[in-house]
Amino acid sequence: MEQPLPTAAAEAAAAGGDGEAYRIRPLELADISRGFLGLLNQLSPSPPLTEEAFRARFEELAALGADHLVLVAEDAATGRLAAAGAVLVERKFIRRCGRVGHVEDVVVDAAARGRGLGERVVRRLVEHARGRGCYKVIINCTPELTGFYAKCGFVEKNVQMGLYF
Amino acid sequence: MEQPLPTAAAEAAAAGGDGEAYRIRPLELADISRGFLGLLNQLSPSPPLTEEAFRARFEELAALGADHLVLVAEDAATGRLAAAGAVLVERKFIRRCGRVGHVEDVVVDAAARGRGLGERVVRRLVEHARGRGCYKVIINCTPELTGFYAKCGFVEKNVQMGLYF
């Protein structure tokens, strides 16, 4: 098995250098056995997802094509997933049938934080939305994370309100 | 032509009383000639939409079925549109493949404000999201509108950030 890169090199590689320690790629069905559900649980603790339910949702999202993209960061050495995020493209009538990218569910494994992985995933999601013709991308986050998203190029805009059933 | 209801009665009717002054219903193709584009322009001023572009986007959204609903409020007396709003249903993996409703592009014609129309449209969009199995509905708004959405049952949650291309 390839020797894991020493931390400093991992940091450089995580920042997108050559010989990447982490590969950012679209979610795959097999990711259910590479730690995807564990990542989700760090984002929003909930009872485990069955493989069947995962597969069904995976296929529903695949049917939406490029309008809904889930990206993951795979540790090149272990094959385990270290981060994930999603973007969905909303089709509007305003702005001459404009499109808006909604970034959702960004999570970095607690053991892999501080290596720029979250920023790499978010930037890839933003580029995907740009490529889909969106005029903007939005993200809702806690006040503690506004600094992180400012680093990714976002600015504070509005208030997010929620209604729970 | 039916005599327009006196203002007080219009207010009562707008609040969903009998003999409704406004009917809340899904967007129709013919709404391009009932003031839909003028409403959008009040929401986000932009060059007029061609009928062809409107039709193409209408059909794209129709293909998403109940996961993307645009509602309008039609003045029963004139057939003109007085309000509009949309909700899109996001399919997630978290929360055991949970769904979230995103309320977007709520607008009430300047001449029809103060009659509870906006609240009626928002409540119908919320009910649609509930019916689609969403565990919550979210909306992004300016600080000035948080009171309105609180009246509709929303609570302040997070910060919305944006990145414009």
Swiss-Prot record, chains A, B:
Substrate binds at S44, K92, F93, I94, R95, E104, D105, V106, Y135, K136. Residues 22-165 form the N-acetyltransferase domain. It is a peripheral membrane protein. Keywords: Acyltransferase, Endoplasmic reticulum, Membrane, Transferase. PANTHER family: GLUCOSAMINE 6-PHOSPHATE N-ACETYLTRANSFERASE, GLUCOSAMINE 6-PHOSPHATE N-ACETYLTRANSFERASE 1. Acetyltransferase involved in de novo biosynthesis of UDP-N-acetylglucosamine (UDP-GlcNAc) in roots and is required for maintaining normal root cell shape. UDP-GlcNAc is an essential metabolite that serves as an initial sugar donor for N-glycan synthesis and thus plays an important role in protein and lipid glycosylation. Homodimer. This is Glucosamine 6-phosphate N-acetyltransferase 1. It comes from Oryza sativa subsp. japonica.
